[in-house]
Amino acid sequence: MIRRRRVAITGIGLVTPVGLDAATTWGNLCAGRSGAGTIRSFDASGFATTIGAEVKDFAVPPALRGARVLKFASRAHRFALVAAEQALADAGLRPEAATSHRWGCSVGAGMMVVAFEELQSVHAFCGRDGEFQPDGLLHPEFPADPIAFCRSQTNAGLALLTQHFGIRGYATSVHTACASGGQALGTALKVMRRGHVDFMLAGGYDSMLNPFGLSGFCLLGALSTDNATPERASRPFDATRNGFVLGEGAGFLVLEDWDAARARGARIYAEFAGDGNSLSSYRITDSHPSGDGPIQAMQQALADAGLSPEAVDYVNAHGTSTPMNDRSECAALRAVMGAHADRLAVSSTKSCMGHLIAAAGAVEAAVCVLAIRDGVAPVNANLQDLDPECNVNLVRGESRRLRIRAALSNSLGFGGSNSCLAFRHPDEVGEPGNDGGPR
């Protein structure tokens, strides 16, 4: 009989709008502190939305300042490098020459990284008739940075991380919009179970807080326009919600073989127990109102982890604060959990951090792991007038203390991609066939 490998989470690194590390981020989420404010990184005064959840006071730490890869790194790439460095330090692990081929990296990332200034430079070579004139663009004296082309590749973050940390095993870059970080972690779990590697550095990063990203979401009507009260603008499941707050950041986890982690005396935050992955195939911008896609993802994650719905004590919902998403996700939760939806704790930490797009699933997975560790379900901030169609047991007012045996993290992306990840308390005994036993 085949014994399935158990996977331990032993390191966490976070760079978010509410903290530059995991401890600060977690403390602020539990306190319900908002990271939203008026956008400072560029002039957003001409947009319908002028607020965002920016990473504040960010600087590359001394340990990374001499890194060669910084030459190629965008702001979002730097978030990733810092969060990954934190996760490895937290785990007390680092790829070495002898083990580098047994390390893998799975990264969730967003759109091509093209600086707004670079777009302006290209636009300068459009003639008055709208026809593009390449001669000037290709001239040796053109001021554009040739490194920008390398930096703009969607897998550039993966390349920078693996180069900097010396990872030579399995590597993949996932691009499924808001589900990217979650699906990158799910991929890492599968790779670990198959024995391709012994360690994985997995997570996601993104920053769409620029004129291009803000204009796109404004045109879609997806963002809150509560510019006078940014700290209250993101209010998932509230009857008055009117859109999400755009954020930025990165989150990374270190995964390793459960038995090896215990043998070396590592602190194990949680077992990475299950992964669910589905497609809604409905619209590019939202899920079907029935919640069919998220239902499949949650059912898959529970089955993969060997968990019954009643064994789950906390769900970190995708909860974007948009009218359609919040209702359909609650319908999906009710369909999967049944009467247990009245008991398990549910919250969306986007109420504090905003929507980190490709990084969201990875950061929120880390939130689930910390919730399991501390026995705390973080508050769903700004929830004052509950939408009656969001009839699940939401964490209101303040964070809730409870023993969390298992937790789910939902991420639902543009294009219909859905991710659900299941995490189990390290003291919980898994179901036969799902905890390393025969199946």
Region roles according to the model:
Residues M1-V69, A91, A109, D259-E271, ...:
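ACP-dependent fatty acid/polyketide chain-elongation machinery
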Residues I9, A22, G27-S173, Y205-L214, ...:
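Conserved beta-ketoacyl condensing-enzyme motif
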Residues L14-A23, R65-E85, M111, D145-R151, ...:
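Active-site pocket-shaping loop/turn-to-helix segments
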Residues R40, H196-N242, D275-P289, G319-D326, ...:
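Acyl-CoA/ACP chain-elongation machinery
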Residues A87-T99, A261-G265, A297-Y314, V336-H340:
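Phosphate/pyrophosphate-binding loops at sites that engage ATP/ADP/AMP, CoA/4′-phosphopantetheine
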Residues C126-D145, G186, K190, R194, ...:
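Glycine-/small-residue-rich "gating" segment that lines the acyl/pantetheine channel
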